[in-house]
């Protein structure tokens, strides 16, 4: 396994819309393993392929504290199950050190393929619903900072650009 570089806001590659995965094979499973290694090392609870500059519809997540519940979503489709909205404070490996409250549908259904290409469906609420919606935004070229005011987004962008300049 190999740790991958995580793109950071405002990198324009984060705005790329991901294409569907056409074939689930050993090459894709290696990418999945590398993404889990990268996510755990960061540390984080979710990572979309877009964040590691691979523009396919692939998400890895693990909400457990001891990293024993890995979830893979290939070509995920999401359906809100309620009109109710739930606010959660979100962070992102591509926007390190910043957290903002984002309101999203409280319950959703996800249809996707697993790491072996088998179709599955899961209903989610609370943190799982928030996380999958956050990661699916990445596949559409969106970031959680797109949900905050332009002023806040510009402030975050300037702070991250300053950090990148200082790091050389």
UniProtKB/Swiss-Prot annotation:
The active site is at residue 135. InterPro entries: Peptide_deformylase, Peptide_deformylase_sf. The keyword Transmembrane helix does not apply. SUPFAM superfamilies: Peptide deformylase. Its cofactor is Fe(2+). It comes from the Bacteria. Fe cation binds at residues 92, 134, 138. One of its GO terms (molecular function) is peptide deformylase activity. Removes the formyl group from the N-terminal Met of newly synthesized proteins. Requires at least a dipeptide for an efficient rate of reaction. N-terminal L-methionine is a prerequisite for activity but the enzyme has broad specificity at other positions. This is Peptide deformylase. The gene is def.
